[in-house]
C-alpha cells in the first residue's frame, strides 16, 4: 500500500470519505437561508406598503382636520365679535387654526374684562366725587335760597304792601327783578327778567314810568304762560 503512487493514494483516501451527508446539510442550510431572505424581503415589502398606506391616510386625516379647524365663513364673523374685533387685530385668519385663534380671543376677552373693570371703578369714583360736589352745591343753594327767602319775608313784614307780595310771588315763579341802581350804565331803569321753564325762553322788560302796573303784570303773566 505504501508503495502506491501518491495520487492514487490521495484519490483512494478521498473516495473513502462520506461527504454526501455534509453536502445535504449544506443544501438544507442554503435553502433555509434563501427562505429566510425571501421571508425578510416579503415582510419588509408588506411593512413598506402598510407604511405608505398609513402615510396616505394620515395626510388625508390632516387635510380634513385642517379643513374643519379652518377659520372661515360664520366662524370668522363670530370671532370678529370677540375681543377687539378690528380688522388689524383679526388679520388674515384664513390659514390659522380655529383653536389657536380662540385661545388668542380668550386672552383678548380677559384683557378687555380687566380694562372694563378698571374703567368701571374710575367711573364709580367720578360719580361719587360728582355726588359729593352736587350735595355740596345743593347745600349752598339751599342756604342762599333760605337767606333770600328770609330777606324777602323780612321785607314783606316790614313793608306789607301789595307790591312786595307781588315781587315775592314773581320770584317764586321764576321772575328776577334787577334794580337800576345795580347797573353800571347810564340807564338806571329797573328790569324784569322773565324765564319760562316750559319754552326755555327769557324775556326782559325795562320798567318805564309810562308803563302802568296793570300792563307790567299782564306782560309778566303772558310771558310766564308762553305768550
UniProtKB/Swiss-Prot annotation:
GO terms for biological process: cell division; sister chromatid biorientation. GO terms for molecular function: microtubule binding. It is found in: Nucleus; Chromosome, Centromere, Kinetochore. Keywords: Cell cycle, Cell division, Centromere, Chromosome, Coiled coil, Kinetochore, Mitosis, Nucleus. Residues 41-70, 107-155 form a coiled coil. It holds the Pfam family Spc24. InterPro entries: Ndc80_Spc24 (IPR013252), Spc24_Fungi_globular_sf (IPR038066). SUPFAM superfamilies: Kinetochore globular domain (SSF143026). Gene3D superfamilies: 3.30.160.430. Its main location: nucleus. The keyword Cell cycle applies. GO terms for cellular component: Ndc80 complex; nucleus. The keyword Cell cycle applies. PANTHER family: KINETOCHORE PROTEIN SPC24, PTHR22142. Acts as a component of the essential kinetochore-associated NDC80 complex, which is required for chromosome segregation and spindle checkpoint activity. Belongs to the SPC24 family. Component of the NDC80 complex, which consists of NDC80, NUF2, SPC24 and SPC25. This is Probable kinetochore protein SPC24. It comes from Debaryomyces hansenii (strain ATCC 36239 / CBS 767 / BCRC 21394 / JCM 1990 / NBRC 0083 / IGC 2968) (Yeast).
Amino acid at each position: 500500500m505504501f508503495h502506491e503512487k501518491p495520487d492514487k493514494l490521495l484519490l483512494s483516501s478521498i473516495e473513502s470519505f462520506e461527504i454526501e451527508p455534509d453536502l445535504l446539510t449544506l443544501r438544507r442550510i442554503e435553502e433555509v437561508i434563501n427562505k429566510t431572505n425571501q421571508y425578510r424581503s416579503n415582510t419588509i415589502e408588506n411593512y413598506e406598503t402598510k407604511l405608505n398606506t398609513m402615510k396616505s391616510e394620515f395626510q388625508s386625516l390632516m387635510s380634513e382636520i385642517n379643513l374643519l379647524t379652518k377659520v372661515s365663513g360664520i366662524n370668522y364673523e363670530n370671532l370678529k365679535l370677540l375681543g377687539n374685533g378690528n380688522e388689524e387685530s383679526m388679520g388674515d385668519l384664513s390659514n390659522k387654526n380655529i383653536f389657536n385663534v380662540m385661545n388668542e380671543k380668550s386672552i383678548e376677552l380677559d384683557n378687555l374684562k380687566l380694562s372694563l373693570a378698571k374703567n368701571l371703578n374710575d367711573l364709580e369714583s367720578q360719580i361719587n366725587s360728582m355726588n359729593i360736589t352736587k350735595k355740596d352745591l345743593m347745600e349752598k343753594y339751599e342756604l342762599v335760597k333760605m337767606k333770600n327767602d328770609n330777606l324777602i319775608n323780612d321785607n314783606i313784614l316790614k313793608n306789607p304792601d301789595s307790591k312786595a307780595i307781588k315781587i315775592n310771588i314773581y320770584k317764586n315763579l321764576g321772575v328776577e327783578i334787577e334794580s337800576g341802581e345795580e347797573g353800571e350804565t347810564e340807564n338806571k331803569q329797573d328790569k324784569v327778567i322773565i324765564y319760562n321753564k316750559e319754552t326755555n325762553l327769557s324775556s326782559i322788560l325795562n320798567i318805564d314810568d309810562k308803563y302802568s302796573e296793570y300792563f307790567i303784570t299782564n306782560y309778566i303773566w303772558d310771558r310766564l304762560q308762553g305768550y
